[in-house]
């Protein structure tokens, strides 16, 4: 069973393993989707990429596919500037893990276009986000790096650009170009799910409020419910 303990404004939820974590999170996720459906609202979510949340998305896909209809919009919290058939593409990951329900129960609001660089694309992507997404997400699912980064908001780098909902980013080690939701846009949500594993990341999280890391800034500025889903 999950154990609950408060951690400042965040609720820290400990699970014995990732399977248990996944079942709990997907159940909560489907409740949000069903609530939105009953009230005739669009359920919009921003999702982290990477290998860690992939099992969550596969289980969500199975649950969504059992619904006759669902008005769900998904967008990435950040995306590498690669084609969506590239193994490193977050949007490609979503389409693969949520393959049964894509185009039926959910639709993608993409962070990419045909521009050569995210810097060139930013204003057009910002316009797309503002036109196609509701003002607030139902929830944002975030991961966190051991360096305290979230989405593609890295330590010491900007977290917003000219009031836009997105910004160009560069990975500090690989120098790979990316596009990311800005911190203010990430915070426009009813709820944040932070999914982390291992003791190293737990320690980073526990010390975040006394830091200037992106995760620390998120915790300090958030006006919404934050749930941390953690397992060893």
List each model region and its residues.
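Ligand-binding beta-strand-loop-alpha-helix segment within the catalytic cores
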Residues: 2-9, 69-141
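Glycine-rich N-terminal segment of FAD-binding domains in flavoprotein oxidoreductases
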Residues: 37, 41-62
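A glycine- and small-aliphatic-rich helix-loop capping segment at beta-alpha/alpha-beta transitions
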Residues: 59-68, 92, 155-163
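A short secondary-structure junction signal
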Residues: 120-122, 151-156, 204-208
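Class I SAM-dependent methyltransferase SAM-binding "motif I" and its flanking Rossmann-like core
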Residues: 142-184
């Amino acid at each position: 069973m999950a154990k609950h303990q408060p951690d400042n404004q965040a609720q820290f939820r400990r699970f014995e393993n990732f399977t248990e974590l996944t079942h709990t999170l997907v159940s909560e996720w489907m409740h949000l989707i069903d609530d939105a459906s009953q009230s005739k609202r669009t359920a919009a979510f921003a999702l982290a990429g990477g290998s860690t949340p992939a099992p969550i998305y596969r289980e969500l896909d199975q649950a969504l596919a059992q619904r006759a209809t669902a008005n769900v919009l998904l967008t990435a919290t950040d995306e590498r500037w690669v084609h969506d058939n590239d193994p490193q593409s977050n949007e490609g990951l979503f389409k693969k893990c949520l393959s049964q329900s894509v185009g039926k129960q959910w639709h993608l609001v993409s962070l990419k276009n045909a521009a050569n660089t995210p810097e060139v694309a930013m204003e057009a992507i910002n316009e797309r986000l503002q036109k196609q997404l509701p003002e607030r997400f139902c929830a944002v699912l975030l991961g966190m790096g051991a360096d305290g980064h979230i989405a593609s908001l890295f330590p010491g780098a900007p977290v917003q650009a000219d009031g836009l909902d997105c910004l160009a980013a560069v990975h500090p080690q690989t120098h790979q170009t990316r596009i990311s939701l800005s911190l203010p846009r990430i915070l426009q949500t009813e709820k944040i799910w932070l999914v982390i594993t291992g003791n190293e990341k737990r320690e980073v999280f526990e010390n975040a409020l006394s830091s200037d890391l992106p995760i620390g800034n998120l915790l300090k500025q958030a006006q919404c419910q934050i749930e941390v889903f953690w397992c060893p």
